[in-house]
Structures are given as structure tokens and as C-alpha cells.
Amino acid sequence: EEELGTELFERSPHKVKLTEEGELFLQYASQILDLVNRSEEEVRIRKEGLQGTLYIASVEGCGPHLFAHWISEFQKMHPHVQYILWNGNTDDVNNRVAKGLCEVAMITAPFNTEEFHVLEVYEEPWVAMIPEGHPLYSETNEPINPNALLPYDLLIPSRESRQGEIHGWFSDPQSMPIIRGRVAHMMNAYELSKNGVGIAIYPESISSLVRDCEVCIRQINHPDAKAFYALIWKKDRTLSHAAEAFIDFVKQNRKVN
């Protein structure tokens, strides 16, 4: 206070609080300390290599496949980085990123571009998983028109926005599909469909669970029946060096076979 020639604290018999000048000084001091810490970290990285733990969250579908590919390649460049991965639906993943429980995450559209940085990385069609013996079962797996699904029980993902998205595939707004269940995890949807509870409507990556002919996979024949995936991270939040490096890596290597 003597050096600056201004009061940084308001003092009373029972408490002390920052003045406006004190708040401003604290803000700049925090930025300076952060810069010092990051500079020390940069020097350490140059000497010892990138280290730390990368906290990741992902939806099902293509999320695990994409992350497995990226981490495998990223690890070759930065072998000392460790990983903690968490899986859930998009709403749960969004919440974890918002609360700072993970730095980088994979979700499906729609995306919250006001709160998160969004890097679109992949898309795949939606499909119908139909149990053997069902009238719509097909050994040739040809595409299916959404209206053909109207008379039958459907199982869809649990995310709130999915029901409206799926309703939009049907030509008659007065004829809505029968939603028998909303299921959070693909494996549950697969088992329910295989046992005749309903037709599972999920992104095409659910077909990776199929091991026999007890179900068939038919692509939904509609231009809007696509699932879009994106990498997200929180705006206005300082990322770890590991997270920054990983995001830069994905930007350059987002295409995955």
C-alpha cells in the first residue's frame, strides 16, 4: 500500500475486505503468479518432456474408438502423460466439463457453443437394431424408411433432446413413434433389443456389439439421421499443458479410419 500510494484493504474491527484497487491488484498478481508457474512448467517440459494426468470424458458410440486411436498416437510423442477416462451420456459429460472434473471430452450434437469450445471430429448415420423374428428383420440389412417404424416399440438414447430429433424424421407430425424405453447405455439397448423388447435406434457404432444374427442393423433412410461428434473443452478456463497438447494433436489428426 505504501509503494502504490493507495489502500488495498478496507479495515473494520470485525473484518477486512479488499477495496476496488485491492481487487484489481489481486487480479494482476494472480495473473503474474500463473505466468511464473506456467513458465517454470515450460522449462521443465523442455528438460523432462510433457507429464501430468489428462482427465477425459466421453460418450459411447464412436467416442471410445476415437479416443483410443488418438491416445495411442499421442502416447508415442508424450510417453509420460497418464490418462483417466470416464464414460456417460452427453448431458453427464457436459456437466463434468462445466464443473472442471475433466478438461477434454467427446459429446454428440447438439453442442453448447456458448460455454464450450467445440471441435467437430466425426459423423455417422443412425440405425435401427431389429431383433430376429421381428417383421422388419432383414438378412440383407437394407436401409429402412422411418415411417416403417411407426407401429413398433422403439428404444432410444436417454438424452432429453434425442426424442425431438428422432420425431423429426417422421413425415406426419400427427403420427409419432412409440417410445418404449429411453436407455443410457448402448450395451443395455443391444440386450433389450436382442430379447425382443423393442427396436433400438442408435448411431451406427452400436453394430460393433453384434456378434451373431440375433439382430440386424438397418440404416435410417433420412437426410437428418446423422450423429455428429465433437471434442469440447471449457471456455475461459486455463488448461493443463497435457490438455493443450492433446487438443492441438487432435486438430491435426482428427480423421480416424
Q: Where are the regions that the model predicts?
A:
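Alpha-helical linker/hinge and terminal dimerization helices associated
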Residues: E2-L4, F25-K47
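A late-sequence structural motif
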Residues: L66, C216-N257
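Flexible hinge/capping segments at coil-to-helix
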Residues: T113-L154
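Alpha-to-beta junction loops
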Residues: V97-I107, W126, S193-A200
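Central regulatory/effector-binding core of bacterial HTH transcription factors
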Residues: Q51-E114, V183
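A short LG(V/I)-centered, amphipathic sequence patch enriched
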Residues: E1-L18
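Beta-alpha-beta core module
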Residues: T113-E120, E124, N188-D236
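Secondary-structure junction motif
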Residues: Y137, E142-P146, Y152-Q174, L239-I247, ...
